[in-house]
A protein has these predicted regions:
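Conserved acetyl-CoA-binding loop of GNAT-fold acetyltransferases
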Residues: 120-129
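Acetyl-CoA-dependent GNAT
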Residues: 7-73, 77-79, 90-92, 96, ...
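Conserved glycine-rich acetyl-CoA-binding loop
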Residues: 77-91, 98-100, 111-117, 121
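Active-site beta-strand termini and strand-to-loop segments that position acidic
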Residues: 53-55, 139-142
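Conserved N-terminal entry element of GNAT/NAT acetyltransferase domains
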Residues: 1-11, 143
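Conserved beta-strand-loop-alpha-helix junction that forms the acyl-donor binding cleft
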Residues: 106-116, 131-134
């Protein structure tokens, strides 16, 4: 099986959004503010993204903001969970963010979700629950 991780480009946005809509948890509702139009600034101005392709089809993606160190997205299509793709697509994003000079990166995710276990297993440290009830995590630049 051919698996490739590469930097995301604008032409990937429709496929990335399809992945975002095909997750088991942290699903977008019909009134969500996250639409295809939400992605370009994160890919071009305030961050960078990566996609993971299996046999040429995007099945996972990750996006991080280089100014704030916020992780905007790490998602894997529900049909491709358990293959290590989340870790694979997250790694270049984490490396890139630290290469931008950040000492700390952070994210939030739904409390009580499987994502918490994923983040803890991939080196993130739980920092608490935010005012919205989401679990917060951070990673510090490796010494």
């Amino acid at each position: 099986m051919t698996v490739t991780v590469r930097q995301a480009i604008l032409e990937d946005v429709p496929a990335m959004h399809r992945v975002r809509l095909a997750v088991r948890e942290n699903r977008l509702g019909p009134n969500s503010r996250i639409r295809e139009e939400s992605y370009p600034p994160y890919l071009e101005a305030i961050g960078r993204g990566w996609v993971l392709e299996e046999r040429g089809v995007i099945v996972a993606f990750a996006i991080g903001e280089h100014e704030t160190g916020n992780i905007w997205a790490v998602f894997v299509h529900r049909d491709h969970e358990g293959k290590g793709y989340g870790k694979m697509v997250q790694q270049p994003m984490v490396e890139w963010l630290f290469a931008q000079g950040l000492d700390r990166i952070h994210l939030s995710t739904g409390a009580g979700t499987r994502a918490q276990g994923f983040y803890e297993a991939t080196g993130w440290t739980f920092t608490g629950i935010d005012p919205h009830g989401d679990a917060t995590y951070e990673r510090l630049r490796p010494q």
